[in-house]
């Protein structure tokens, strides 16, 4: 994460995350800007409905974990801004960006990325497409990947990164503050059982392409 500094009471923080386009991962930078003025919370950068709804999940999760939600004008930009962002994967990095910008957290590690959906209680829920995002993390120079605990085994299949399984926001905040470290996940070793095949539910967007493939598979 980057902390460019304060100016006129404003603070900008960047948090590394990952997104999914089709079946390929790509890096996303979550930029959180706190400034003066009437309190507001805007998310820009081509977010879909699920991403825009992250505002309420983040607000509730911050309060339930005992942190202070910033009373500021909040602007969150998801870069690259010309790539549509889908799903709930950005909940966690948005929350961390806000808490870092408001100095509830120390600066985040620059080689770390974060992803995961938040419940209103601050628990982390699994997200789809973690493996291609984890593979992208290695290519992007990310060395630490924080994911929902139920996604950790899948993420460990990617080489070159250390995966941290996160159960809830309070646990992660204690880890980032240096209070209670989260043990890294051990690499998952398949045991030879039949593995589930890839599912279209893991592909974000591409509805027309998926429809064509379904018709072809049915013999239509």
Q: Would you name each region that the model predicts?
A:
Residues 2-220:
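Peripheral, non-AAA+ core regions of ATP-driven protein-machinery
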